[in-house]
Design a protein with these regions (language model features):
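Active-site core of bacterial EAL-family cyclic-dinucleotide phosphodiesterase domains
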Residues: 1-9, 46, 163
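Short glycine/proline-enriched coil/turn segments at helix->beta-strand junctions
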Residues: 11-12, 37-40, 101-103, 124
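Structural preference for long, well-ordered alpha-helical segments in enzyme cores
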Residues: 5, 9-10, 23-31, 61, ...
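Residues at alpha-helix caps and immediate loop-helix transition turns in enzyme cores, especially N-
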Residues: 2, 56-58, 87-91, 116, ...
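The catalytic core of metal-dependent phosphodiesterases that act on cyclic dinucleotides
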Residues: 64-138, 149-178
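Catalytic core of bacterial c-di-GMP phosphodiesterases, primarily the EAL and HD-GYP domains
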Residues: 15-90, 165
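Conserved acetyl-CoA-binding loop-helix of GNAT-fold acetyltransferases
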Residues: 19-22, 143-149
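Short, contiguous acidic/charged loop-to-helix segments that flank catalytic cores in large enzymes
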Residues: 10-14, 18, 52, 135-141
Length: 178
């Protein structure tokens, strides 16, 4: 089941913390197996804004992570650009608690290239995922960074660009330029 399919039902029903908990548990299993194999690979684990705000789920989640900081080198928590941009005091405090434990973040579902890379880095974001379509369209407005310059901007700020949703062979060739 793809996230877009279950999220339409889970979000209005207030079930996203439960869904995130299940996904987190599975991600931790994968990370533990990678660690046994001495792999340096990372696993991206999506967390919804609903979970960051959940007064029952999130404190327990942070407490678990406090006891499992060894996961920080392999587990990257991922948030949509909408969640990052819409983060209020509670969400920011939640992210700060995880960052203080050494966990890194990724911003995905990026549709607007107008963001402050330095601010993202300061909040422990180390990855930004942009779709191939967004990169190849190269859409920008006056004064904003062009998609072709995004990789260098992010690199200067200690953030790695990941181009995702590459679905056609021609796109592979085109995105290699980034």
């Amino acid at each position: 089941i793809m996230p877009r399919d279950y999220m339409r039902v889970a979000e209005p029903a207030g079930m996203m913390p439960t869904v995130d908990n299940i996904l987190l548990f599975r991600c931790i299993q994968v990370v533990r197996k990678l660690a046994q194999r001495k792999s340096k690979a990372g696993v991206f684990c999506n967390i919804s804004a609903f979970s960051l705000l959940d007064e029952e789920f999130f404190p327990q989640f942070v407490e678990y992570m406090q006891h499992n900081t060894d996961l920080a080198q392999h587990l990257i928590f991922e948030f949509s650009q909408a969640t990052v941009n819409g983060a209020g005091h509670v969400e920011r405090a939640s992210l700060e608690a995880l960052a203080a434990l050494g966990f890194r973040f990724s911003m995905d579902q990026v549709t607007d290239l107008r963001f402050d890379a330095g601010s993202l880095h300061d909040r422990n974001f180390r990855f930004v995922k942009v779709s191939a379509a967004t990169m190849l369209e190269g859409t920008h407005t006056a004064g904003d960074i062009h998609a072709a310059d995004l990789k260098e901007l992010l690199k200067r700020n200690g953030i790695q660009l990941i181009v995702d949703k590459v679905e056609h062979e021609r796109e592979v060739v085109d995105v290699l330029d980034y």
